[in-house]
């Protein structure tokens, strides 16, 4: 047994390598000859590079890797090279689309387009299919839901995993052969297949050459129909061949627009899909498995600044009046006054009349005299604190909001492993109010997410209060809570006064919380915090006021400061101090005589966050830090099955084939979320590579000298127990794209992926 060195994972000697290999090993056991990666020596970093994407909110930059061919000529091919350090900031990603833009109405199966000849897109379906890349080949899943394979009976699971692995080997072999065969066509009409593999029609028909009959479309297998229609990259799963195309038979060709093919649907699957019973159903679009869609007319009014806010102007006006009142007081008076504490009381009718130039003085006085109790509109009726939904979180597993990587397919993947509470990716308040489609897509909820909220980030009440109102009004039915980000450490956010900058401005944070809570109505508001902005922790002062003065519905605390980032271990002792501070504040509030006639206040749930990498960490923090639960971030990124380990209290030595099926599972979820057309496939590929940039850091338990292992322990170069395990552990982005090829087909020649960390660089070779 090796001696443990802090910061280095204790891998058994028989699995160690001197450097990461220059040529990746193929899944059939041979050495790949088409890779352009180089050997990399193990160089421990001072700071572990397991940072969530919140470190870098923009996704933009060009790849900067160079081919190893020139280095090989100079005799440098086999020399280990020190890994590049730092991040690729400002990354950019290419938008890959079809060479020919097919009309959407034609693509979905209509014989004609309502725009006729004036349509900007092509209606020539035969020409489109001739230029379309070959269908992607995938084996069928044992069940139609594409859920985690561990729910499949053992005998079926073993057969399926073997089939999946054979498919991966076949696709990998094809890719290597293509990379080494310089005379190969870019999109061959047919390729090498196993006896059980899907096959293209045995014809020289150029229209039908790209169709692979028998492949599996994730949409069609689950729902009995595919909304992508003819644009689907798995077209062979939902077409029927009637005859040859017009290129062979001319006018005698059958099928749609002379293709010799027709789209098909599975009525039994369609019926089963429409009669499913999810946690949250989209009543307006029962065929969709997602809720919280923003209506197009609402987005248009937001973009043109014509959206009417009923609550926000009155709330922000009331908050400004409180600021004026407090500024006129002495420090002693401000400390003892009730101004700025407790639920915000807003006279909406009076504020509306004051802002209306045509309102009479008598009407304003009547509204002021009535105290706003005679509300004419139901959506401005005040919700009392006791009417707010209380968060009953105790021991539920909370997947942290993760920018870029915490997308809907990843949350769905974690849900299949047992996560309970999900929070969407951080969205900026300004972008919500401007109606940006990319920002509003972050509030999208999969129908199977049991508890779901969205996270917003902003610097002042004038932005966050209107955001809270529009969220509550437009998608409030699909939100269980709204979270305010008070922990984002990146300079772009911090310098605007948002994120962790709010930790140094508690009074402003209090106004934000009270204003948003009023605008949200019955929806609870939570806040996500860090220990402070510098090495001196200050957040316990916020915990003393968060519930008793501001009425927050829940808190989560990351046990690191903004300055620390991920350089040191999370401070769970300080998390306990903050929890105890909140409990003491609630106890004191209940004992004060002025609150004797009010119901006793019950402490809201508090979740800790930081360095939870196994079930032992989870239960240890639950017991000693006095938290109601633990929020899991990097632990879920590196091994999404951590939720299963926690619930079953076991160390799961997951096999390489089970991990491969998890990747297949994510790809299926991505295709049903972003689409199975060319653009959707490559969007899925990009985010799959983002996920693999974290999951490759997992060190299989069977390779370790002892467990548990610490999250910040980085592994030296090692090989797995089989070629697939070695491939899944590769730190090279080249291999991540290679893995994506198994389920999403070969990456287009112009497609590239720039990893967040420079040490993982990859560039597609055309």
From Swiss-Prot:
PROSITE patterns on file: UPF0034, ZF_C3H1
Tell me where it mainly resides.
cytoplasm
Single GO MF annotation: zinc ion binding
Bias category Low complexity: which stretches? Answer: 188-203
- Annotated active site: 488 (proton donor)
| EC number(s) recorded for this UniProt protein | 1.3.1.89, 1.3.1.-
Function, as annotated, reads: Catalyzes the synthesis of dihydrouridine, a modified base found in the D-loop of most tRNAs. Specifically modifies U47 in cytoplasmic tRNAs. Catalyzes the synthesis of dihydrouridine in some mRNAs, thereby affecting their translation.
Family label: Belongs to the Dus family. Dus3 subfamily.
Q: Which PANTHER family match?
A: TRNA-DIHYDROURIDINE(47) SYNTHASE [NAD(P)(+)]-LIKE
How is this protein named in the record?
A: tRNA-dihydrouridine(47) synthase [NAD(P)(+)]
Q: Which gene encodes it?
A: DUS3
